[in-house]
Regions:
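Structured catalytic-domain cores with a bias toward divalent-metal coordination
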Residues: 8-316
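Gram-positive cell-envelope targeting signals
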Residues: 2-7
Length: 316
């Protein structure tokens, strides 16, 4: 019995899921030129391939779609310092990625992204790239202005007036507002965050859903998923690597095709609700905690799928 439980927890079941016939996997993604917000989601925060994809797609958008603004699920103020760095500011690339605000970005892949932007700007002084953060979770500055007693009193009153603060709804609402503020300064912007934040549909009003409701935003979203992920995650004060299977029939079909990477146009999918992988900065062994059961055709305009994705290495 113990062995069966171990097998179930490792694979997330006693099979690797279903597959779908007749899917056309492409090697290149074509992003419509009239879109103003192009969003890329990542199924996890702990895999190299999803971080590499940020750079690959951004390069394409710079070269083919005229995009010059990059925005990430990172600290708003810290990313202003990153923007200074890519415009020739002092410091190192590692120091710059640390300013984004989360350890998940302290990787070689993110450093490569920042280096590309800095190098680009050095040779394109009149056509530069800008870097933005649109998250709003940093509140340490409050400690300098208010006592713990004052902060707790204010929070209690605010929550009494607005119960929405007890959920992720407010965070996504403000992230959407921040992206729209960025868009007011830019012709187009490339937005990177977790799948759940950029999706056009979900169990709550996500940033992506709010942005997609306004036609003038020209919202286009690319989701990602994996068949098997060896994911870098925090656990009891350290980083560990754990293996997860998504049970996504699309990625299983990709595996059966012999490819490791494939791109699909979701409008051509003949599937509705399916399992997909979804990991944040935490996990449980039960499959329901790292899988979602949702309709990819409604959530995304396109998807980049991987069979195997490998763990990031966090640089201290």
């Amino acid at each position: 019995m113990a062995l069966l439980v171990m097998v179930y927890c490792y694979f997330g079941g006693f099979t690797t899921g279903d597959y779908v016939d007749g899917i056309e996997f492409k090697d290149e993604i074509v992003i419509p030129s009239d879109k103003r917000i192009i969003a890329l989601g990542e199924a996890t925060h702990g895999n190299k391939e999803f971080q590499e994809l940020k750079l690959n797609i951004f390069k394409k958008l710079v070269e083919e779609n005229g995009v010059r603004a990059f925005a990430i699920e990172g600290d708003f103020g810290g990313c202003l310092e990153v923007n200074e760095y890519i415009h020739g500011g002092s410091g190192s690339t590692l120091e710059a990625v640390k300013k984004i605000g989360f350890k998940i970005y302290q990787t070689k892949e993110m450093m490569n992204l920042i280096d590309y932007m800095r190098d680009y700007n050095l040779s394109h002084l009149d056509d530069d790239i800008r870097f933005y953060g649109f998250d709003m979770q940093r509140t340490k500055y409050l400690d300098k202005e208010y006592s713990d007693e004052d902060i707790n009193l204010y929070l209690k009153e605010i929550k009494r007036q607005n119960k929405e603060l007890d959920s992720s709804l407010l965070r996504d609402k403000y992230m959407a507002q921040n992206v729209e503020w960025i868009l007011s300064r830019e012709d187009k912007v490339f937005v990177c965050a977790h799948n759940e934040h950029v999706a056009k549909w979900g169990s709550y009003d996500s940033m992506g859903k709010l942005l997609s409701l306004k036609e003038e935003n020209g919202y286009y979203v690319i989701g990602t998923d994996f068949y098997k992920s060896k994911c870098n995650l925090p656990f009891m004060g350290k980083r560990i690597v754990r293996t997860f299977y998504s049970h996504d029939p699309l990625t299983k079909s990709l595996k059966m095709s012999g490819k490791n990477v494939g791109i699909i146009d979701t409008s051509k999918l003949d599937v509705d609700y399916i399992y997909m992988g979804s990991l944040g900065e935490g996990f449980y062994l039960i499959p329901q905690s790292y899988r979602i059961f949702q309709p990819p055709k409604t959530m995304y305009d396109a998807m980049v799928l991987f069979v195997n994705v490998n763990p990031t290495d966090i640089i201290e």
